[in-house]
Amino acid sequence: MSKSKFERKKPHINVGTIGHVDHGKTTLTAALTRILSEQYGGEFRAYDQIDNAPEERERGITIATSHVEYETEERHYAHVDCPGHADYVKNMITGAAQMDGAVLVVSAADGPMPQTREHILLARQVGVPFILVYLNKADMVDDPELLELVEMEVRELLDSYQFPGDDTPIVVGSALKALEGDTSEIGIPSILKLVEQMDAYIPEPQRAVDQPFLMPIEDVFSISGRGTVVTGRVERGIVKVGEEIEIVGMRETQKTICTGVEMFRKLLDEGRAGDNVGVLLRGTKREDVERGQVLAKPKSITPHTKFYAEVYVLSKDEGGRHTPFFTGYRPQFYFRTTDVTGAIDLPDGVEMVMPGDNIQMTVSLIAPIAMEEGLRFAVREGGRTVGAGVVSKVIE
């Protein structure tokens, strides 16, 4: 088995397989690594190597995930596959594996099943922007009309969660046949067709440095004769000396000017995504700024108190609660650098939430936070993490 190193010149895309248990997600993942490693180098990972995924701890949550990588003509892909349904739920909500696109695997023999629906809903809630479909196990279906029927069902299901069902690429094949080296249409060619569609359908994500500037404030200092300095790690974009920026969250949005950027005691012209910097703010008093606010490019992000969220509640074994909670529960919501108290409303018909569940809820915070869809947070009680969530929609 050749272990040739990847050239890192190609654009990098994060993807993953989603879909119902036993529809063939892991077999497809193995087939992708086998066929593409033969074409473009990289490492073939067998089914059982992928299936016994190591457990990782992400923000105190135990998630089993397999990471594989492969290359196409155009791109380098990092691909995640999870052994169990609960792992998918946790993975998608915590953002442990942020996906630029997902491959939904549906067994042609069974059609869409409950987790097919649940994974599409999760993808919608957590902001996975693009879904492609691999209609698997086509070798078990003799009737072409049945295939068409399943394809129609999948497209309608995607539509019902606001994905463009009619325009979604659907590739019919058999991951197992492809893995076994079958060269008929449903074998290896179906895998090559799938990656061709991935290259074409999933756009290259915008790099962090090209996005609008945002820096969560971690600390605030007053330097005599210089003014107020805030420190933090630039999450995205670039801030240049002399630019106008906004301070957003916790209170009224304020405008200020960046008059200096400092890193490791050196003065810079700019701070870029990934840098830990101190930013000097003109005319801003120390008491006007606090941890939990963000510095941002003007008008790029707004403060909100009320939102819909998808939340995973830690199980007792993960150090979470031992008892359920109900509507009106008031924990802290930890966004970026700080905790804000909020009250939760459960959906109609949901009495309570048990540890280990995932749930859609409405949250009302007591102070506004700079927020947008896709923002991750932790749910805490007195400093202990009891849940993880993602903002699925801002309300007000």
Curated annotation (Swiss-Prot):
Q: Which residues bind Mg(2+)?
A: T26
- Keywords of this protein's UniProt record, alphabetized? Cytoplasm, Elongation factor, GTP-binding, Hydrolase, Magnesium, Metal-binding, Nucleotide-binding, Protein biosynthesis
Q: Which CDD domains does this one have?
A: EF_Tu, EFTU_II, EFTU_III
* Endpoints of the signal sequence: none
GO MF term list: GTP binding; GTPase activity; guanosine tetraphosphate binding; translation elongation factor activity
Q: Where is this region: G3?
A: 81-84
- Region: G4; residue ranges are 136-139
Q: Which Gene3D superfamilies match?
A: P-loop containing nucleotide triphosphate hydrolases (3.40.50.300), Translation factors (2.40.30.10)
Query: Among its keywords, does the record have Nuclease?
Result: no
Q: What is the annotated localization of this protein?
A: Cytoplasm
Q: Which cysteines are joined by disulfide bonds?
A: none
Which reaction is recorded as catalysed by this protein? GTP + H2O = GDP + phosphate + H(+)
What domain of life does the native source organism fall in?
Answer: Bacteria
All residue ranges annotated as the tr-type G domain in the record: 10-206
Q: Give the EC number(s) under which this enzyme is classified.
A: 3.6.5.3
What are the binding positions for GTP in this chain?
A: 19-26, 81-85, 136-139
Alphabetical list of InterPro entries matching this protein: EF-Tu_GTP-bd, EF-Tu_GTPase, EFTu-like_2, EFTU_2, G_TR_CS, P-loop_NTPase, Small_GTP-bd, T_Tr_GTP-bd_dom
On assembly, the entry states: Monomer.
Function, as annotated:
GTP hydrolase that promotes the GTP-dependent binding of aminoacyl-tRNA to the A-site of ribosomes during protein biosynthesis.
Q: Which PANTHER family match?
A: ELONGATION FACTOR TU, MITOCHONDRIAL, ELONGATION FACTOR TU-RELATED
Protein name as it appears in the record:
Elongation factor Tu
What is the species listed in this Swiss-Prot or TrEMBL entry?
A: Nitrosococcus oceani (strain ATCC 19707 / BCRC 17464 / JCM 30415 / NCIMB 11848 / C-107)
